[in-house]
């Protein structure tokens, strides 16, 4: 029998395997890098979408609550100014009047209405102030008249009190005179009674003569 021919050992290509392993490692690294890049792109897209949503929400809030003075001109803003200044000083009616070279055609209608409304308010306040001053003056005149009448009444009362004191004094003097006259009359009556008694005793006849 012939000996079987020894089979050649399989060739192992170490270099080719190393190359394939390195190629597989590079492909994995590329895939990882690609996934990281895709994730970063997705995050950026998500952030941009969030920013767009926030901007839309802010614009929606602005649309829901618009600022009334945002798109107004200076002439329109005059309508929202208060009638009285903030510092407390009252502005005169002349300051609120339109300028001498006032042309209604060059101003919006609302501004004219607002200025007229301000002027009407000033006129009403001024008329109320004049009425209040007239009422205060009338009350002052009434108070002055009452004070004068009170002073006159006090003078009359003092005069009456003086007259009453004089009358009381006179009455006291008259009462004293009356009492003195009563005493004198009583003395005279006693003297007359005594004289009559003496006369009767003198006219009576003695008993021996009979």
Curated annotation (Swiss-Prot):
Any one annotated GO CC term: nucleus
BP term (GO), one: flower development
UniProt keyword annotation of Coiled coil present: yes
Region (Disordered): 1-97
Intracellular or extracellular location(s): Nucleus
Compositionally biased residues, Basic and acidic residues: 45-54, 62-79
Top-level taxonomic group: Eukaryota
UniProt note on tissues of expression: Mostly expressed in leaves, seedlings and floral organs, and, to a lower extent, in panicle, roots, nodes, internodes, leaf joint and sheath.
Induction of expression: Follows a diurnal expression pattern; levels increase after dusk, reach a peak before dawn, and damp rapidly thereafter.
Coiled coil stretches, renumbered: 29-49, 129-184
Keywords: Coiled coil, Flowering, Nucleus
UniProt keyword Oxidoreductase present: no
InterPro entries the record matches: HDR1
Disruption phenotype: Slightly shorter plant. Early flowering phenotype in long days (LD) but not in short days (SD).
Role of this protein: Regulates flowering time via a photoperiod-dependent pathway. Suppressor of flowering that upregulates HD1 and down-regulates EHD1 in long days (LD), thus leading to the down-regulation of HD3A and RFT1. Triggers OSK4-mediated HD1 phosphorylation.
Subunit structure: Interacts with OSK3 and OSK4.
Protein name: Protein HEADING DATE REPRESSOR 1
